Curated annotation (Swiss-Prot):
The gene is rpsS. One of its GO terms (molecular function) is rRNA binding. GO terms for cellular component: cytoplasm; small ribosomal subunit. This is Small ribosomal subunit protein uS19. Protein S19 forms a complex with S13 that binds strongly to the 16S ribosomal RNA. It comes from Tropheryma whipplei (strain Twist). Keywords: Ribonucleoprotein, Ribosomal protein, RNA-binding, rRNA-binding. Belongs to the universal ribosomal protein uS19 family. GO terms for biological process: ribosomal small subunit assembly; translation.
Length: 93
């Protein structure tokens, strides 16, 4: 269920401080974060945020179409390797 409009978007304060500091200094260095729950706001446009996927940080470049989504949506946590095409063990039974 989406968040109430009267509350506004949730962004972790430590992440918001880093984004605002980058905007003030016109510095676009990569920001490393573990906050997958933070919503992408217009202030983040043009930044590259490295989102943790449980094992490593995935760099995500923020574009206009991403505003309103959560950071975790762009760093998948599970690796799908596909189904086995020719499984000889299953065929024998």
């Amino acid at each position: 269920m989406p968040r109430s409009l009267k509350k506004g978007p949730f962004v972790d304060m430590h992440l918001l401080k880093k984004v605002r500091a980058g905007n003030e200094s016109k510095d676009r260095n990569m920001i490393k974060t573990w906050s997958r729950r933070s919503m992408i706001i217009p202030e983040m446009l043009g930044h590259t945020i490295a989102v943790h996927d449980g094992r490593r940080h995935i760099p995500v470049f923020i574009t206009e179409s991403m505003v309103g989504h959560k950071l975790g949506e762009f760093a998948p946590t599970r690796t799908y390797r596909g189904h086995v095409k020719d499984d000889r063990k299953a065929r024998r039974r």
